[in-house]
């Protein structure tokens, strides 16, 4: 919950910046805002699972729906390291990738600071890659996540006083999967797409 609220708060701060900040900052908002419905669905599914527990098929169904929302918002795997993915295959490949990233981070959440630290490393990697490729919207969309993870890591590091839970770890993995795909769309490199898992 704290991580999700921190990310939303950072997006809100960007919205409230004075006009003197210019269109440079505003350009990054569409990425974060387009992904907000999908991210919120993943978060609330994880939250319900933390509180009440969900059956695996229920979680999978909701995660696939969230991945579909992200695909509709523009997160579409069109190529992998220069290999063009046929249009008819783009949706299932994207769904598989995003659900896989979300659950991969969920699996490593058992050790204090591991998922948060890996998430921060992957976020910074994508941020640097976006800056080097002049992908300003993606760079600005990753900054709120990097800030939220950095602030959370202080309390999640050993000995942890707060934990990500399913709501946090699933959301981090899902967002990083989305950001990796968006990076690869510009650079056509496998590094961008696999950054979340390489962390």
PLM ranges: what are they?
Residues 10-25, 43-54, 71-84:
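Transmembrane alpha-helix boundary signature
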Residues 23-27, 31, 51-56, 83, ...:
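Membrane-helix interfacial "entry" motifs
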Residues 60-76:
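Hydrophobic alpha-helical transmembrane segments
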Residues 102-103, 112-116:
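PRPP/pyrophosphate-binding module of the type I phosphoribosyltransferase fold
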């Amino acid at each position: 919950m704290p991580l999700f609220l921190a990310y939303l708060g950072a997006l809100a701060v960007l919205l409230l910046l004075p006009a003197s900040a210019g269109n440079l900052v505003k350009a990054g908002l569409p990425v974060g805002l387009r992904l907000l419905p999908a991210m919120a669905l993943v978060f609330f599914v994880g939250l319900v699972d933390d509180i009440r527990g969900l059956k695996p098929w229920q979680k999978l169904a909701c995660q696939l729906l969230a991945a579909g929302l992200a695909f509709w918002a523009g997160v579409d795997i069109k190529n992998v390291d220069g290999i063009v993915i046929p249009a008819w295959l783009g949706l299932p490949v994207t769904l598989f990738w995003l659900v896989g990233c979300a659950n991969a981070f969920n699996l490593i959440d058992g050790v204090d600071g591991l998922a948060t630290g890996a998430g921060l490393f992957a976020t910074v990697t994508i941020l640097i890659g976006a800056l080097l490729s002049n992908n300003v919207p993606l760079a600005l969309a990753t900054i709120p996540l990097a800030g939220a993870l950095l602030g959370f890591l202080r309390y999640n590091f050993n000995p942890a006083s707060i934990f990500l839970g399913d709501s946090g770890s699933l959301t981090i993995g899902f967002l990083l999967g989305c950001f990796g795909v968006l990076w690869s769309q510009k650079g056509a490199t496998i590094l961008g797409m696999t950054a979340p898992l390489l962390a």
